[in-house]
A protein has these predicted regions:
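Acyl-thioester-dependent acyl-group transfer interface
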Residues: 1-57, 67-91, 222-285
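Non-catalytic, low-complexity flexible loops and terminal extensions
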Residues: 2-3, 107-115, 119-200
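Short, solvent-exposed beta-strand edge segments and adjacent coil->beta transition regions
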Residues: 19-21, 96-98, 186
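Secondary-structure transition/turn motif
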Residues: 63-68, 103-107
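A short acidic-Thr-Gly-centered motif at the start of a beta-strand
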Residues: 90-95, 166-168
Length: 285
């Protein structure tokens, strides 16, 4: 068993923590039998993603789970780590032309689960379309698993931090009047953007696509809520693998950047806002 250090913050919560779901929309209807074979093969290559949680003395550990991982046809999200998922901390479901992979951040983060998803899609498409696609960049069953893939990014020792260099972070932001903690009252909308055009616009402003999206969304919130007296604080997820020298690990390496956006910022050119945001990086958590 391996004790969980990274990802601990997602385990000790009063009401648990919602899983994160990656939805893949295929062009054609999903064939369950092909998906199951692809999932079984991917589980052989990524055994560390099929583990279960074990609590011992108030600490949580990852332990081998011999239950088969099964792709289920349903549009419901099943509780991870429960009997319904064979106690696994990830779950693969499908309906229509959609494949959904749900995972718990105590096990891994988005970048950590992506090679697993890519392996499933590669295997599935080879079966579905009776074609051998290029496997470049795909981690296949039978390949050796580097130790770096399962490395724990956090040690028991604290990193040295120059407290004087750490800038204060704004947490107290404007909340939308319709915001609610009741899941049944939540909804989501989708916006389709031309990728090349958006990336070009971000580069022209000296920003990353994520940073530009955050600024645009924050601006929209303030334009629709001119009465807001507090800044809109956008939380941006950050991959800290490069910073800690653990590029290959699947474990949780997510940090958070807090980007405040005020009514005064609406008068500032995007290029200047991007420069200011980049300069605040040392204060990001």
């Amino acid at each position: 068993m391996k004790q969980i250090r990274s990802g601990q913050s997602f385990l000790y919560r009063t009401n648990g923590y919602d899983s994160t779901v990656v939805e893949i929309r295929m062009r054609d209807k999903v064939t369950g039998s092909y998906l199951q074979v692809a999932l079984t093969n991917a589980a052989r290559r990524f055994p560390y993603l099929t583990q279960k949680l074990v609590e011992k003395g108030g600490a949580y550990y990852l332990h081998r789970d011999d239950n088969s991982i099964v792709a289920v046809k349903t549009d419901k999200f099943r509780t991870l780590g429960s009997m319904a998922t064979g106690y696994h901390l990830l779950d693969v479901t499908y309906t229509g032309n959609c494949i959904r992979v749900a995972f718990h951040h105590g096990l891994c983060d988005g970048r950590g689960v992506m090679p697993f998803i890519e392996a499933i899609l590669y295997d599935y498409c080879c079966q579905k379309y009776h074609k051998k696609f290029s496997s470049e960049g795909i981690r296949l069953p039978g390949e050796p698993i580097p130790e770096e893939e399962t490395a724990e990014p956090f040690s028991r020792e604290f990193y040295e931090v120059d407290e004087q260099a750490v800038q204060p972070v704004e947490h107290d932001g404007f909340a939308l009047p319709e915001s609610t903690s009741t899941p049944d009252a939540c909804y989501h909308s989708e916006i389709l953007l031309d990728e090349d055009t958006f990336v070009h616009a971000a580069k022209a402003a000296g920003a990353t696509p994520t940073l530009l999206a955050a600024m645009l969304l924050s601006r929209c919130v303030l334009e629709l809520n001119p009465q807001a007296e507090k800044p809109v604080v956008c939380n941006l997820a950050m991959d800290l693998r490069s910073a800690i020298g653990k590029e290959l690990t699947h474990r949780n390496c997510v940090g958070t950047a807090y980007l405040p956006y005020t009514a005064e910022d609406m008068k500032t050119a995007p290029e200047e806002l991007a420069r200011l945001a980049q300069s605040r990086r040392p204060s990001w958590r």
